[in-house]
Design a protein with these regions (language model features):
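Phosphate/NTP-binding elements of NTP-utilizing enzymes
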Residues: 1-254
Length: 254
């Protein structure tokens, strides 16, 4: 489906003036030569919504989607778009509970950039040291891979943090370290992606419930514990959820 089952609605009509999603889609198609599928385009347009002051509406984007859906390709496009087109050279941080996952996504982005002569010409350096992989552009833009842990990303101010496999985070250590890195930068976003988690996925469960409560708790995650007048107090306007999932109680083959 192009549209997720559960999602944070936009504050106003989305146009080229109120979302940078179209810019990112055009970068994918006209520069990288990648044709995005409808759900990827829909998500970029909605998740890159702008506030009236021109900053991103969402500081945190939670993406729930099945494996093999094209999630990694979209994240790579997003990362390169910001690296090459942001006015201020950004720092992109890629992280995951398993470093191999973050390095695999980073490697794909490097290959994308190298495959386009105009982009390849802007590459200053590609660091391949174990645990310190980085793509550096002439402009000063960086895309670094960090292990998700207490030290992951600390001391770095990330403009875009790509946090994959959120379901694997069973403690708050890594999330706290990474989320902390973006607070110092205006225009920064954390994109946290995952497929469905289980009871041990504490970070995913909390972020999902917080976002759902702001939407009136459509799946009953709070178990009726939140009074309607409390929903506004608990809502976090800077948290967006985009969830492609089956409704509770639906058959597995829906």
């Amino acid at each position: 489906d192009e549209v997720p089952r559960v999602w944070t609605p936009s504050l106003r009509e989305l146009t080229r003036e109120t979302s940078r999603g179209w810019e990112c889609i055009e970068f994918a198609e006209q520069v990288l030569g990648i044709t995005l599928v409808p759900w990827q385009k829909w998500l970029l347009i909605h998740a890159l919504e702008l506030l009236p002051d021109g900053s991103f509406r969402f500081e945190t984007v939670v993406l729930l989607v099945a494996r093999q859906s094209g999630k990694s390709t979209m994240m790579q496009v997003l990362s390169l778009w910001r690296m090459y087109l942001d006015r201020r050279p950004p720092l992109i941080i890629g992280t995951a509970q398993n470093l191999d996952i973050a390095e695999h996504m980073w490697r794909g982005a490097v290959e994308m950039a190298r495959s386009v002569p105009e982009l390849s010409a802007e590459i200053e350096n590609v660091r391949l040291d174990s645990g310190k992989k980085a793509l550096e552009l002439v402009s000063g833009s960086h895309y670094k891979v960090q292990a998700a842990g207490r030290r992951g990303g600390r001391g770095l101010s990330g403009d875009l943090v790509i946090l994959d496999e959120l379901r694997e985070h069973q403690t708050w250590e890594a999330w706290s370290a990474v989320a902390h890195t973006t607070l110092a930068r205006s225009g920064s976003q954390v994109w946290a992606a995952s497929n469905a988690g289980d009871r041990s996925s504490v970070v995913l469960a909390h972020l999902r419930m917080t976002a759902h409560i702001a939407l009136g708790d459509p799946d009953g995650l709070a178990g009726g514990e939140v009074a309607p007048d409390e929903i506004g107090e608990l809502a976090d306007e800077s948290l967006g959820i985009f969830e492609w999932s089956a409704a509770p109680g639906s058959a597995l083959d829906d």
